[in-house]
Amino acid sequence: MILITRPLAQATNLKSLINNLGIKTALFPTFEINKIKAEIPKQKFDVIIFISANAVDYAEQYFNNIIVEPISIFTIGPITAKKLIEKDIKVDGYPKNNSSSKVLLNMPYFKDLKDSEILIVRGKGGSEYLKNTLQVKNNVNYFEVYERVPCDLTRLHSQSIKEFLKVDDGVIVINSLESLSLMIELVNKESKIFLDQFKTREIIVLSDRIKEQAKILGFKKITVTLNPSDQDVVDLLGSKNNKKITRI
């Protein structure tokens, strides 16, 4: 069984792909995504960085205001880049294998970047690492277009916990540091014993950064996907190392 911690509105495709492998799934949303009213920046930018696919979706109505040529457009990873390309927006670069701010900043373009106006399109809150690094030599602004609202513990969460713990070979899919933190909080509210059991299960994470935090929190069996796409997660689950997973 696979525990999916994404917002319910974004879990459908992954759930379907996993079920098609003959593997059961349980939904465990840790937060939901809400659109927020964004203040349109007045200045022109040299560089725009989109942090997530959600950032692309919720900023789309502002594209005519913020994407003014000449401009260079980057994303935090391939999924976000694909989302922009689908909307006919040219993407100048992105980390190909590991979606992270650190990998993005190691690209040659950013190592030499200075005296530029940069806009980071993202959700409200989150890591300040990218901005703090870039603003040493540049002027950096945020354009926040959505917010993450943590989920309360519901009947769905309680049912999913119990179903998930009925099998010994369950796998948890974690998309972000926030998902990891909120999952622990929700499971702990249900039962400290359940949380201890969760930490014995394998988890699949989407970056080395999440892996390191999961280690600190007590998880032992941690796998990082090569790419954070639904298909890569499914390919990993369907690989030889995961044939032990209880199937439908």
Q: Where do the language-model regions lie?
A:
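Signature of uroporphyrinogen-III synthase
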Residues: M1-I248
